[in-house]
A protein has these predicted regions:
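Catalytic cores of nucleotide-sugar-dependent glycosyltransferases that transfer UDP/GDP/TDP-activated
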Residues: 1-487
Length: 487
């Protein structure tokens, strides 16, 4: 099968979140299964042209009512046959940032920028003489691709090409003023005809949902949640209408990077038969975070983006967050790695000055993230919603019992300990009291039933989260998309 991934980001070239990891990991797994996979994305300012191969002759790409000349460069995912093509347009992409910057969180001309990406993807296929079976668009920034395929170019060259749209996070939809519609390079009839109109403006993701042949999201539970009023961000009605083409497919993880048996970033490697070695990792974590070195005290790890979605208010809000109570009333240590909303960063630093058993690193550090996974006894994720989540999976792999809220991918990957079996601890409500109670329950099991706690750790470590399993599910979705256009 020939598969074209259209994306705003892909590791190792550009990354703002888990989407970039998923695109590359899925492409690699599909390639290993024998499929011809290519990725197309913008060449941002920080992607060095000197490390890429120039493709002679620019593309003429629709931009508003005219055309723009777009250069093309080529590379590949490391140690693979997956070609990565970069669309080069200095005005649109030659800037620092994928979607925006710290000072301008959302570039005002993103509709124009990502219309160049989507139109350019099809022009690239023409240039290469390579016509995919599947165009796989990722999130709102690539949502114009299914629209173009269905309403603009489904002629002889792309007559047998189907589209799949993956929603990584429904909270981000690409909503802009109607004034930007001409920059999309499509005729005005598609403002309504392709489902782009939303509250008098443009909603790129809504258009993609309306036009894609198949729609996937990153966990089965999240696929259900986005069809509800509570979890639908205004798209639930449309998603229910299109419910027969919506599938939830769990992300896999890169086991070459996240594997306690081989991880070079932790002080000692281990597996489910040598869990006692986690104590070495725990002592190193306590030392690095300047926590008292004590094997007997359970350590709770937190690695997170400090954003409302992640349940930070329930932990850190000055008037009602439970972190101070948790560290004062339960004999635990807490190791935090994260950055994000300034109020939360400041509150964490304030709490740290009052609590000797809570330490934080504001920012991101790859080696510390691995050490927290390996050295903690528990990993806390009180997310309000979580499309898939990866850290709870890393935690299970590393024998670190996740404490999570029952939502999205967290509900699909963690089994609540019921007294006899389970791989972690689940709570239902997004409240400080619910978080506190779940932590207390988990620590009680750890302290008073070592055999049960070891069984929880081993249950998580025996799970299979490889991308091979996820890739097969995506292939099934691709085949379903192709059947739909055969009708």
């Amino acid at each position: 099968m020939k598969i074209l991934m259209v994306t705003a980001e892909a590791v190792p070239f550009a990354k703002t979140g888990g989407l970039a990891d998923m695109v590359s990991a899925l492409a690699l797994s599909l390639s290993k299964l024998g499929h011809d996979v290519k990725i197309v994305m913008p060449r941002y300012y920080k992607i060095d042209r000197k490390k890429l191969q120039a493709i002679p002759g620019p593309l003429a790409v629709a931009a508003g009512t005219s055309e723009s000349w777009v250069g093309v460069y080529e590379s590949a995912l490391p140690s693979s046959n997956v070609a990565v093509y970069f669309l080069d347009h200095e005005g649109a992409f030659g800037r620092d940032g994928v979607y925006g910057t710290k000072s301008e969180t959302d570039f005002h001309d993103n509709p124009y920028r990502f219309s160049l990406l989507c139109h350019g993807a099809f022009q690239l296929c023409r240039k290469l003489g390579w016509y995919p079976d599947i165009v796989h668009a990722h999130d709102w920034s690539a949502s114009l691709a299914p629209i173009i395929l269905k309403h603009v170019i489904r002629n002889d060259l792309f007559a047998k090409t189907a589209s799949v749209l993956t929603i990584h996070n429904l909270g981000y939809q690409g909503q802009y003023a109607k004034d930007w519609f001409p920059s999309l390079g499509i005729h005005w009839g598609l403002y309504y005809g392709a489902g782009l109109e939303h509250n008098g403006g443009i909603n790129l993701l809504q258009g993609g949902i309306s036009c894609a042949d198949m729609i996937t999201t990153v966990s089965p539970t999240y696929a259900k949640e986005i069809q509800t009023t509570e979890g639908g961000f205004g798209m639930d009605g449309l998603l229910r209408v299109r419910g027969d083409v919506v599938r939830g497919i769990l992300n896999g993880i890169d086991e070459d990077v996240w594997n306690p048996k081989t991880d070079p970033l932790i002080p000692v490697n281990y597996d489910e038969t040598s869990l006692e070695k986690k104590a070495v990792c725990k002592r190193e974590l306590q030392k690095r975070m300047k926590l008292p070195e004590d094997d007997a005290v359970p350590v709770i790890g937190i690695v997170t983006r400090l954003a409302d979605q992640k349940g930070i208010a329930e932990l850190f809000a000055p008037t009602y967050g439970c972190m101070y109570r948790l560290c004062s009333e339960i004999d635990v240590q807490v190791a935090i790695l994260g950055s994000g909303e300034k109020w939360c960063e400041n509150e964490i630093l304030s709490l740290q000055s009052k609590l000797p058993n809570m330490r934080a690193y504001i920012g991101y550090d790859e080696s510390l993230s691995h050490l927290i996974e390996a050295g903690s006894d528990f990993f806390l994720m009180p997310s309000k919603y979580e499309p898939c989540g990866l850290n709870q999976i890393y935690s299970e792999m590393y024998g670190t019992a996740p404490i999570v809220r029952r939502t999205g991918g967290l509900a699909d990957t963690v089994e609540d300990f019921d007294g006899t079996s389970g791989s972690g601890f689940i709570f239902n409500e997004s409240t400080p009291d619910a978080v506190f109670s779940a932590v207390k329950r988990a620590v009680t099991v750890c302290r008073h039933d070592e055999k049960a706690f070891a069984a929880i750790q081993e249950a998580g470590m025996r799970k299979n989260f490889s991308w091979d399993k996820s890739a097969e599910a995506y292939l099934s979705a691709y085949r379903a998309a192709l059947k739909r256009i055969e009708r």
